[in-house]
Swiss-Prot record:
Pfam families: HOOK (PF05622), HOOK_N (PF19047). InterPro entries: CH_dom, CH_dom_sf, Hook_C, HOOK_N. It comes from Drosophila erecta. CDD domains: HkD_Hook. Keywords: Coiled coil, Cytoplasm, Cytoskeleton, Developmental protein, Endocytosis, Endosome, Microtubule, Synapse. The coiled coil domain mediates homodimerization. It is found in: Cytoplasm, Cytoskeleton; Endosome; Synapse. This is Protein hook. Homodimer. Interacts with microtubules via its N-terminus. Transmembrane segments: none annotated. PANTHER family: HOOK PROTEINS, PROTEIN HOOK. GO terms for molecular function: dynein light intermediate chain binding; microtubule binding; small GTPase binding. Involved in endocytic trafficking by stabilizing organelles of the endocytic pathway. Probably acts as a cytoskeletal linker protein required to tether endosome vesicles to the cytoskeleton. Involved in modulation of endocytosis at stages required for down-regulation of membrane proteins that control synapse size. Not involved in synaptic vesicle recycling. Required in R7 cells for boss endocytosis into multivesicular bodies (MVBs). Has a role in regulating adult longevity.
């Protein structure tokens, strides 16, 4: 809502406050219930807005109930529109109807402004309009201007309405002459009212001009007195204009302006007197017209009474039609009631039959109760037996697994036993050879003692330490073989699990193909349980396989660590062996310089020891390591190939000709061993 519209509302509210009303009418909330507006309309035109109509407006218990406000405002607006159309013969088709809901709920100022405009039009066009116009003229100039603007908007939107048909036309056949006179008088009254309105507007404009001229005259008189008091006057450019004296140029100009203003004042006063005379003439004409209007109002009152009688007859006719419609509905209901009675009889007969059937069913239920208990017992026994069978099968699987583990351990122990027996035989042979060689080595004992005494203490300690480590590595080779055996067992277990998984997958695929080939609705109940069991077995096997793979990877890591340690030890032994040979050659040279006989004996003993070391140590070590590496590489290659084959088959089966459920039941392809190792 813009500012000027709010100003118009507040000016209309100030005019409305001047009315003597019983209901509160000081603000928008008090006007929103419609009580004050109804009282004002009753005060303006009591013959149209009667006391009976005013009693229909609910004044008490309205409060904040917007529905009661809405009903009051509807009655007020409807009666106002009827007053404009019937009494004033004005059409408000171009005037936007106020939104009553927004007034009742939110007290919208814009909509209240439109409603107050309509009420103002009723006040200006009523029988006692002169008193209300004088009250408006007593208000402030701004309020008068806003009220005049509101009246101009209302005058611009209203139009002369054509003669309406209906009940009035039917009644006007009897009193056509009176209506024609009333229409002519009404038109004369409207023309005079329009002339009065225009003269009032001209009067207001002239009054405004008069006030403006008086203000300008007062200002000029003040300026003239100020100029007479002061001897010198300074112009706009700051130059002194000199004293205002008679006969001077400035005095003549001021005198001429004063004369012009006096002439204009005289013209305005003459025009005002002319307008006063015209207004008096129009007042006399208005009095004559009011007398004629009163006569016409009496005739219009008779017409309204006839209208009321016609409305009463209409209402009675409508009530009669409603009663006839109700009679027809009651007849239909009576027919429906008779039909319902017949249906109730049929239902009673059926209920009697149902009672007999229920009695028979109860007897049958008592008979079947005993058999039902036995069936439930058998079901429980079957469930217990199934649970026992599952437990026994799981125990059997565990025992088989333990048996396989024990067999593997037994084989490993047997192999260790065989290796120990071989070592024992070798040691016995070595002891026998040493016993035989002690006799031959007594002669060369002095040379060896001399050579050992000749060797430095650091090299002797290193050689002793290397010999001890060599023995420990030989002894630990048995543990390494045990680890290799464990790795072989784990690989075998992985192969067994993969074979079982392969058979399970083949069985699943065969069942899925069979279920697809036959009718799925008939075979679904038969193959559902088997597929679920096989899927559970498949998941268990995959978990076991993953565990075995993790064990095999850990064992392979251990084997690789041991291999690296062995290679490092062998390199250290080779380095120390080269140093040892250098030291021996130096010792030989020293001994040759001392005694050539001892040197020849030393050469023979050193060559025998070196040949024994070469024959004993590297050959069996390298052969065992090569065999273990070859077997582990072979098992890895077999596992990777088998897994790739299974994944390719699963990918082919999942991609071609399978239903959505069959694809969901298939297990996802597993990751490769290389990816698991990298993790």
């Amino acid at each position: 809502m813009s500012a000027p519209k709010n100003e118009m509302y507040y000016s209309l509210l100030e005019w409305f406050k001047t009315l003597n009303l019983n209901a509160p009418h000081a603000d928008a909330e008090s006007l929103a219930d419609g009580v004050a507006l109804a009282q004002a309309l009753n005060q303006f035109a009591p013959e149209s807005f009667t006391d009976a109509w005013l009693s229909k407006i609910k004044a008490s218990a309205v409060g904040s109930n917007w529905r009661l406000r809405m009903s009051n405002l509807k009655k007020v607006t409807q009666s106002v529109y009827d007053y404009y159309s019937d009494v004033l013969n004005y059409s408000l088709s171009d005037f936007s109807k106020p939104d009553l809901q927004s007034i009742a709920e939110k007290c919208d100022l814009g909509e209240l402004e439109r409603l107050l405009q309509l009420v103002l039009g009723c006040a200006v066009n009523c029988a006692e309009k002169q008193s209300y116009i004088t009250e408006i003229m007593c208000l402030e100039e701004e309020l008068q201007a806003n009220i005049m603007r509101a009246l101009q908007e209302l005058e611009a939107t209203r139009q002369a309405s054509s003669a309406e048909g209906g009940v009035v036309s039917s009644l006007s056949r009897s009193s056509r002459t009176g209506n024609l006179d009333s229409k002519a008088v009404q038109e004369d009254r409207d023309a005079l009212a329009q002339k009065c309105f225009e003269t009032e507007k001209k009067m207001l404009l002239l009054i405004d001009e008069k006030t403006n001229l008086q203000q300008e005259l007062h200002k000029l008189q003040q300026e003239f007195s100020r100029l007479e008091q002061h001897s010198t006057v300074i112009g706009d450019d700051g130059v002194s204009l000199g004293p205002v004296q008679t006969g001077s140029v400035r005095y003549n100009e001021l005198r001429r302006q004063l004369d012009l203003l006096k002439e204009e004042l005289l013209h305005s006063e003459g025009a005002r007197e002319d307008l006063k005379l015209k207004a008096q003439q129009q007042d006399t004409d208005l009095l004559h017209m009011q007398m004629r209007i009163e006569e016409l109002m009496k005739s219009s009152a008779e017409v309204t009474t006839l209208k009321d009688e016609v409305d009463v007859l209409r209402e009675s006719n409508d009530k009669l039609k409603i009663c006839e419609a109700q009679l027809d509905t009651y007849k239909k209901k009576l027919e429906d009631y008779n039909d319902l009675k017949k249906q109730v009889k049929i239902l009673e007969e059926r209920s009697a039959d149902y009672v007999q059937q229920n009695a028979q069913f109860e007897e049958d239920a008592k008979r079947y109760a005993n058999t039902k208990g036995q069936v439930e017992l058998f079901k429980k026994e079957i469930q217990d037996l199934h649970a026992k069978l599952d437990a026994e099968s799981s125990k059997n699987v565990k025992l088989e697994f333990d048996n396989k583990n024990l067999e593997g351990k037994n084989l490993a122990l047997q192999r260790a036993k065989d290796s120990l027996l071989k070592e024992r035989d070798n040691l016995r042979e070595a002891v026998d050879e040493l016993k035989c060689g002690q006799l031959s080595s007594n002669t060369a004992l002095t040379g060896t003692t001399v050579s050992r005494e000749m060797q430095p203490s650091a090299t002797v300690e290193k050689l002793q330490r290397l010999e001890a480590e060599n023995k420990a590595l030989r002894e630990g080779q048995g543990g390494q073989t045990a680890l290799a055996q464990l790795l072989d067992d784990a690989n075998k277990r992985c192969e067994n699990l993969r074979e079982q998984l392969k058979t399970a997958n083949e069985r699943i695929l065969s069942l899925s193909h069979a279920s697809q080939s036959d009718d799925p609705i008939l075979k679904e109940s038969e193959f559902g349980k088997q597929i679920k069991q096989l899927m559970e077995l498949n998941e268990q096997k995959t978990l076991q396989l993953e565990e075995a793979v993790t064990q095999s990877t850990s064992l392979q890591c251990k084997v690789t660590q041991l291999e690296t340690n062995l290679s490092a030890r062998e390199q250290e032994i080779l380095v120390y062996d080269a140093k040892y040979r250098k030291c021996v050659e130096k010792a030989k040279e020293v001994i040759k310089s001392i005694d050539p006989r001892i040197a020849s004996a030393l050469d023979a003993s050193v060559l025998e020891k070196s040949s024994d070391l070469v024959e004993e140590e590297p050959k069996p070590k390298m052969s065992v390591m090569e065999e273990q590496l070859m077997t582990s590489a072979f098992y890895r290659l077999g596992v990777n190939a088998q897994r790739d084959a299974i994944d390719s088959k699963l990918a082919i089966l999942m991609g071609s000709g399978q239903t959505f459920l069959a694809r969901q039941r298939q297990s996802a392809p597993r990751k490769s061993l290389s990816a698991m190792k990298s993790k």
